[in-house]
Amino acid sequence: MASPRAVQLSLRKPTHAVCVVGVETLVNVYSDVPKGAKTFGVSGSSEVKIYMVYDPSRVAEPAGWAHWPLDANVDVVVVADTVSKDLYDFKVKVSYFESQEAAALAHSVLYLTAVDVSLDVDTGRTGKVKKGSGDKKTWRWGPGGSGAILLVNCDRDIHGSREDLHANHLKSLEDLQDMSPMVLSCGGPDELFESHKLVLKASLSDSRRLKVFCARGGTSLSNYKQVLGPRHSSYEVERHSGERAIQFYVEGLAFPDASFSGLLSLSVSLVDTRPLSEVSVFTDSVTFRVAPWIMTPNTQPPLELYVCSVTDIHGRNDKFLEDMSHLATKANCKLVVCPRAENRNDRWIQDELEFGYIDAPHKSFPVVFDSPRNRGLRDFALKRILGPDFGYVTREIEFAGASGLDSFGNLDVSPPVRVGNTDYPLGRILIGGSFPKPSGRRMARVVRDFLQAQQVQSPVELYSDWLSVGHVDEFLSFVPTSDQKGFRLLLASPSACLQLFQEKKEEGYGEAEQFDGLKHKAKRSINDILADKHLRRDSAHVQKCIDWNREVLKRELGLSESDIVDIPQLFFLKGAYAEAFFPDMVNMVVLGKYLGIPKPFGPLINGRCCLEEKVRSLLEPLGLRCVFIDDFLFYHQLLGEIHCGTNVRRKPFTFKWWNSVP
């Protein structure tokens, strides 16, 4: 806590000073003491509270009208509890005595003008500004925490423009809802502000990451003036006669990142302009934290399902779009089809973007994270998704192109988990990389740094560089369940698939064929698959890679074996990297209890696909509904599946991120 401002007294003439309502002022009774004085007494106006600060081990509080000793280091602190009506209308008098019974040797007089200067924000996180609510300079996490929250104003309230944060003037009154309110109290005699000014400031680094707009009433956009921002780090406040409070609105310009913690501070100073060198009388400060970008896991209810309309040598993917429409209808989810004119025949919408959201007590809205992949869908998020109350953020890779691991099929998030004594109420981000290999492909540092800096979904890096495409969604998924755990982790499992095929062989179905029903793929019997030494060798290698991730996931997400479901799946090696042997079933789209699963075209046993039946037996007892969809020609043959070719915007968490403790 800062020391109170000190005022020096004089026996020769009255002292005049300015104080702030509710703020302590130290009156220095030792600066000019009459000769022979040994004690002193203090009196003052009724509007001024007088406090004596002393060490009880050195001096006792005098009784009645007795005086205080001058040799006991007793401090006098005064606090005005109301605003002055006129200049210097409050009085404090200090009288000095030689003894308790003697008349006063001399008097010092202090005349005070009390002003109300306070910078206030929503430190209580209620959505409303409350004056003088606790420590405004310190931002604290947790349910009992405090501190204001700032949204990055990354949506677009006016069609045809860029994100609102790029504008130097207010473009719509609706845009104020995306900003955090801030109130400057400035009550006091108008005459005082002829010799004093109020200065609103941010540091140079902070001013590059926020903007402040001053509101002057009315409904015209011209009533809102930008006063702080990248070009202006200080602003001399224009206080009107009789004005007691001024409304401001603050917007964020940047998300937390490697070089930015997310904390931003603003201060207001009452400055005395009479001296040759201006003197600050009082400063009040507030601190904001920029709201992080938050991902939503498969366990959150779906709101919109995105899919692309494309054409290739097999024609148009109309049947797949129809299947997606039926699935979305079952899940009561809106279907959004991105036309070919907007996707440039790029079908991999999962790789292009990731839906998340930002949240503050006064406002929340979805924000799409556009990957640095920049292929046919590169303009879709910016041109078609960005809009009113729908934000946009991206990260670009400088001096190099994006690798396959920079696509957002390589970005996922777990449901909420508890690991030991640590809670992750918003889950943990999962990305794929090359570890434990000494070298290989990794997600670009600029993306990893961004994800890490959000703090509330502490990322875990998995091993995905064993795959040709290299994405985590090729070997894992999460599904919601209605039991106490609330979810299961699905892992692709070559061992489970080979075991299933062995069981079917022993039951007498060894001649049943994989890829039955496909015109464009040679069939292979169960016997042939089980006898394929190369496929078995590849399966053993892939299983080791998945098992390595299994242990990491168990450790980092606090999972037990009962939380994991092994989904039968075979892979083969092409060079040093693995690809799915048949449509990869864990690469599914999850819409509540409805799962859109790539149809595996497995061996038919009594007219039913044994792979589908196995997956149903694993998942449907958990309350899930398996819908198998043919994606073979348009997706699987191009090394992707349903999850790669779809994207889902989900309902935000009800849990408030500021109640977490990273």
Swiss-Prot record:
Coiled-coil segments: none
Keyword terms, alphabetized: Calcium, Cytoplasm, Hydrolase, Metal-binding
Chain positions recorded as Ca(2+) 2 binding sites: D155, D157, D178, K363
Requisite cofactors: Ca(2+)
Catalytic activity: L-arginyl-[protein] + H2O = L-citrullyl-[protein] + NH4(+)
Active-site residues per Swiss-Prot or TrEMBL entry: C644 (nucleophile)
Major location (coarse): cytoplasm
Gene3D superfamilies in UniProt: L-arginine/glycine Amidinotransferase, Chain A, Protein-arginine deiminase, central domain, Protein-arginine deiminase, N-terminal domain
Annotated positions binding Ca(2+) 3: E352, D370, S371, N374
UniProt-annotated location(s): Cytoplasm
Cited PANTHER family: PEPTIDYLARGININE DEIMINASE (PTHR10837), PROTEIN-ARGININE DEIMINASE TYPE-1 (PTHR10837:SF11)
Name under which the protein is recorded: Protein-arginine deiminase type-1
Gene source species: Mus musculus
